[in-house]
Protein backbone atom coordinates (compact mmCIF):
# COMPACT_ATOMS: atom_id res chain seq x y z
CA UNK A 1 0.00 0.00 0.00
CA UNK A 2 1.36 3.42 -0.93
CA UNK A 3 1.83 6.39 1.38
CA UNK A 4 -0.95 9.00 1.56
CA UNK A 5 -0.56 11.94 -0.78
CA UNK A 6 0.62 15.34 0.34
CA UNK A 7 -0.82 18.55 -1.06
CA UNK A 8 1.53 20.45 -3.33
CA UNK A 9 1.80 24.13 -4.24
CA UNK A 10 3.06 25.52 -7.50
CA UNK A 11 6.31 27.48 -7.36
CA UNK A 12 6.40 31.25 -7.90
CA UNK A 13 2.77 31.58 -6.78
CA UNK A 14 1.70 30.43 -10.23
CA UNK A 15 -2.02 29.95 -10.84
CA UNK A 16 -1.80 27.06 -13.33
CA UNK A 17 0.57 24.41 -14.67
CA UNK A 18 1.39 23.06 -18.11
CA UNK A 19 2.20 19.37 -17.65
CA UNK A 20 4.14 17.69 -20.42
CA UNK A 21 2.98 14.07 -20.49
CA UNK A 22 4.90 11.21 -22.05
CA UNK A 23 2.29 8.48 -21.46
CA UNK A 24 -0.66 7.53 -19.27
CA UNK A 25 1.22 5.21 -16.86
CA UNK A 26 3.77 7.92 -16.00
CA UNK A 27 1.32 10.82 -15.88
CA UNK A 28 -1.54 9.09 -14.03
CA UNK A 29 -0.08 9.57 -10.56
CA UNK A 30 1.11 13.09 -11.38
CA UNK A 31 -2.34 14.04 -12.63
CA UNK A 32 -4.15 12.65 -9.59
CA UNK A 33 -1.71 14.35 -7.20
CA UNK A 34 -2.28 17.68 -8.95
CA UNK A 35 -6.05 17.17 -8.69
CA UNK A 36 -5.72 16.28 -5.01
CA UNK A 37 -3.71 19.46 -4.51
CA UNK A 38 -6.32 21.63 -6.21
CA UNK A 39 -3.87 22.72 -8.90
CA UNK A 40 -5.28 23.92 -12.21
CA UNK A 41 -3.38 22.27 -15.06
CA UNK A 42 -3.47 21.19 -18.69
CA UNK A 43 -1.84 18.19 -20.35
CA UNK A 44 0.65 18.95 -23.14
CA UNK A 45 1.29 15.94 -25.37
CA UNK A 46 4.30 16.43 -27.62
CA UNK A 47 6.30 13.25 -28.13
CA UNK A 48 7.71 13.00 -31.67
CA UNK A 49 10.15 10.37 -30.42
CA UNK A 50 7.49 7.65 -30.14
CA UNK A 51 7.62 5.26 -33.07
CA UNK A 52 6.12 3.55 -34.94
CA UNK A 53 2.91 5.50 -35.41
CA UNK A 54 0.82 2.57 -34.12
CA UNK A 55 2.60 2.80 -30.77
CA UNK A 56 2.33 6.59 -30.73
CA UNK A 57 -1.43 6.52 -31.25
CA UNK A 58 -2.02 3.88 -28.57
CA UNK A 59 -0.03 5.85 -25.99
CA UNK A 60 -1.73 9.12 -26.91
CA UNK A 61 -5.24 7.64 -26.82
CA UNK A 62 -4.61 6.15 -23.38
CA UNK A 63 -3.53 9.57 -22.14
CA UNK A 64 -6.57 11.24 -23.70
CA UNK A 65 -8.87 8.65 -22.10
CA UNK A 66 -7.52 9.38 -18.63
CA UNK A 67 -7.55 13.16 -19.15
CA UNK A 68 -11.19 13.03 -20.24
CA UNK A 69 -12.08 10.93 -17.20
CA UNK A 70 -10.86 13.79 -15.00
CA UNK A 71 -12.00 16.64 -17.30
CA UNK A 72 -8.45 17.86 -17.82
CA UNK A 73 -7.69 19.92 -20.96
CA UNK A 74 -5.52 17.93 -23.38
CA UNK A 75 -3.28 19.81 -25.80
CA UNK A 76 -2.44 17.51 -28.69
CA UNK A 77 0.69 18.85 -30.35
CA UNK A 78 2.17 18.04 -33.76
CA UNK A 79 3.75 14.59 -34.13
CA UNK A 80 6.76 16.27 -35.82
CA UNK A 81 8.70 13.07 -36.52
CA UNK A 82 10.79 14.48 -39.37
CA UNK A 83 12.35 17.07 -37.07
CA UNK A 84 13.03 14.45 -34.43
CA UNK A 85 14.87 12.15 -36.84
CA UNK A 86 16.81 15.10 -38.23
CA UNK A 87 18.01 16.03 -34.75
CA UNK A 88 18.82 12.41 -33.95
CA UNK A 89 21.18 12.03 -36.92
CA UNK A 90 24.55 10.71 -35.81
CA UNK A 91 23.12 9.55 -32.47
CA UNK A 92 21.43 6.38 -33.69
CA UNK A 93 23.73 4.10 -31.71
CA UNK A 94 24.03 6.14 -28.54
CA UNK A 95 23.03 4.30 -25.34
CA UNK A 96 19.93 4.91 -23.26
CA UNK A 97 20.37 7.97 -20.99
CA UNK A 98 23.05 9.30 -23.35
CA UNK A 99 23.20 12.32 -25.63
CA UNK A 100 20.34 11.14 -27.86
CA UNK A 101 18.03 11.12 -24.84
CA UNK A 102 19.25 14.60 -23.87
CA UNK A 103 18.42 15.80 -27.37
CA UNK A 104 15.00 14.18 -27.12
CA UNK A 105 14.16 15.79 -23.78
CA UNK A 106 15.47 19.14 -25.04
CA UNK A 107 13.25 18.99 -28.11
CA UNK A 108 10.10 18.16 -26.18
CA UNK A 109 10.73 20.70 -23.44
CA UNK A 110 11.61 23.44 -25.91
CA UNK A 111 8.14 23.06 -27.41
CA UNK A 112 6.51 22.90 -23.97
CA UNK A 113 8.32 26.05 -22.82
CA UNK A 114 7.30 27.90 -25.99
CA UNK A 115 3.67 26.88 -25.54
CA UNK A 116 3.78 27.91 -21.89
CA UNK A 117 5.21 31.32 -22.81
CA UNK A 118 2.67 31.93 -25.57
CA UNK A 119 -0.34 30.79 -23.55
CA UNK A 120 0.08 32.32 -20.13
CA UNK A 121 1.57 29.41 -18.19
CA UNK A 122 4.34 30.60 -15.88
CA UNK A 123 5.25 27.06 -14.83
CA UNK A 124 5.61 23.79 -16.70
CA UNK A 125 6.70 20.34 -15.62
CA UNK A 126 6.79 16.78 -16.98
CA UNK A 127 5.75 13.29 -15.99
CA UNK A 128 8.98 11.89 -17.47
CA UNK A 129 10.87 12.02 -14.18
CA UNK A 130 8.57 9.64 -12.31
CA UNK A 131 9.94 6.62 -14.17
CA UNK A 132 12.71 4.73 -12.41
CA UNK A 133 14.16 3.98 -15.84
CA UNK A 134 14.95 7.67 -16.37
CA UNK A 135 17.78 9.88 -15.11
CA UNK A 136 15.95 12.59 -13.19
CA UNK A 137 18.92 14.97 -13.17
CA UNK A 138 19.18 14.70 -16.96
CA UNK A 139 15.47 15.45 -17.35
CA UNK A 140 15.51 18.38 -14.95
CA UNK A 141 18.57 19.91 -16.60
CA UNK A 142 16.74 19.83 -19.94
CA UNK A 143 13.60 21.37 -18.46
CA UNK A 144 15.49 24.18 -16.75
CA UNK A 145 17.48 24.87 -19.92
CA UNK A 146 14.28 25.11 -22.00
CA UNK A 147 12.67 27.47 -19.50
CA UNK A 148 15.72 29.75 -19.48
CA UNK A 149 14.96 30.89 -23.04
CA UNK A 150 11.85 32.78 -21.91
CA UNK A 151 11.31 35.48 -19.28
CA UNK A 152 9.28 34.49 -16.23
CA UNK A 153 8.95 30.83 -17.26
CA UNK A 154 9.85 28.27 -14.61
CA UNK A 155 10.44 24.52 -14.92
CA UNK A 156 9.09 22.73 -11.84
CA UNK A 157 11.58 19.99 -11.02
CA UNK A 158 9.49 18.32 -8.33
CA UNK A 159 10.47 14.70 -7.60
CA UNK A 160 7.26 12.84 -8.48
CA UNK A 161 8.73 9.54 -7.28
CA UNK A 162 8.88 10.52 -3.62
CA UNK A 163 6.16 10.33 -0.94
CA UNK A 164 4.85 7.12 -2.48
CA UNK A 165 4.50 8.50 -6.00
CA UNK A 166 6.33 5.64 -7.70
CA UNK A 167 4.15 3.07 -5.90
CA UNK A 168 0.91 4.92 -6.70
CA UNK A 169 2.00 5.15 -10.33
CA UNK A 170 1.86 1.36 -10.55
CA UNK A 171 -1.36 1.13 -8.54
CA UNK A 172 -3.13 3.57 -10.86
CA UNK A 173 -1.82 1.82 -13.96
CA UNK A 174 -3.29 -1.47 -12.72
CA UNK A 175 -6.58 0.13 -11.67
CA UNK A 176 -7.01 1.87 -15.02
CA UNK A 177 -5.60 -1.07 -17.01
CA UNK A 178 -3.35 1.25 -18.96
CA UNK A 179 -1.44 0.10 -22.00
CA UNK A 180 1.95 -1.18 -20.80
CA UNK A 181 4.68 -0.09 -23.18
CA UNK A 182 7.84 -2.18 -23.08
CA UNK A 183 10.37 0.32 -24.41
CA UNK A 184 11.00 4.03 -24.00
CA UNK A 185 9.56 5.14 -27.30
CA UNK A 186 11.97 5.68 -30.17
CA UNK A 187 12.89 3.14 -32.83
CA UNK A 188 16.42 2.93 -31.48
CA UNK A 189 15.12 2.05 -28.03
CA UNK A 190 12.85 -0.56 -29.59
CA UNK A 191 15.79 -1.99 -31.55
CA UNK A 192 18.07 -2.16 -28.52
CA UNK A 193 15.38 -3.61 -26.26
CA UNK A 194 14.63 -6.33 -28.79
CA UNK A 195 18.32 -7.13 -29.13
CA UNK A 196 18.57 -7.55 -25.37
CA UNK A 197 15.41 -9.67 -25.19
CA UNK A 198 16.64 -11.98 -27.92
CA UNK A 199 20.01 -12.34 -26.16
CA UNK A 200 18.03 -13.56 -23.14
CA UNK A 201 16.03 -16.04 -25.21
CA UNK A 202 12.88 -13.90 -25.10
CA UNK A 203 10.53 -12.96 -27.93
CA UNK A 204 10.56 -9.56 -29.59
CA UNK A 205 8.18 -6.91 -28.30
CA UNK A 206 4.67 -7.14 -29.72
CA UNK A 207 3.15 -3.70 -30.05
CA UNK A 208 -0.30 -2.94 -28.70
CA UNK A 209 -0.97 -6.17 -26.82
CA UNK A 210 0.21 -5.75 -23.22
CA UNK A 211 -1.94 -3.95 -20.65
CA UNK A 212 -1.70 -3.57 -16.89
CA UNK A 213 -4.15 -5.61 -14.82
CA UNK A 214 -5.27 -5.54 -11.20
CA UNK A 215 -4.10 -9.15 -10.98
CA UNK A 216 -0.50 -8.26 -11.89
CA UNK A 217 2.06 -8.93 -9.12
CA UNK A 218 3.52 -5.90 -7.37
UniProtKB/Swiss-Prot annotation:
GO terms for biological process: queuosine biosynthetic process; tRNA modification. It catalyses: epoxyqueuosine(34) in tRNA + AH2 = queuosine(34) in tRNA + A + H2O. It is an enzyme of class 1 (oxidoreductase). Disulfide bonds join 184-186. It comes from the Bacteria. Its EC number is 1.17.99.6. GO terms for molecular function: 4 iron, 4 sulfur cluster binding; epoxyqueuosine reductase activity; metal ion binding. Pathway: tRNA modification; tRNA-queuosine biosynthesis. Disruption phenotype: Queuosine is observed in queG or queH single mutants, but queG-queH double mutants accumulate epoxyqueuosine and lack queuosine. Belongs to the QueH family. Catalyzes the conversion of epoxyqueuosine (oQ) to queuosine (Q), which is a hypermodified base found in the wobble positions of tRNA(Asp), tRNA(Asn), tRNA(His) and tRNA(Tyr). This is Epoxyqueuosine reductase QueH.
Amino acid sequence: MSKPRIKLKLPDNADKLLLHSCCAPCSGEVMETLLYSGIDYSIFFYNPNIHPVKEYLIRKEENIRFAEKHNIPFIDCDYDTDNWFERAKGMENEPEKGIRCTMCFDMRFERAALYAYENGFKVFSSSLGISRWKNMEQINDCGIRAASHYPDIHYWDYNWRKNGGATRMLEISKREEFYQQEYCGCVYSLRDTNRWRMSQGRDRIQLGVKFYSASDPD
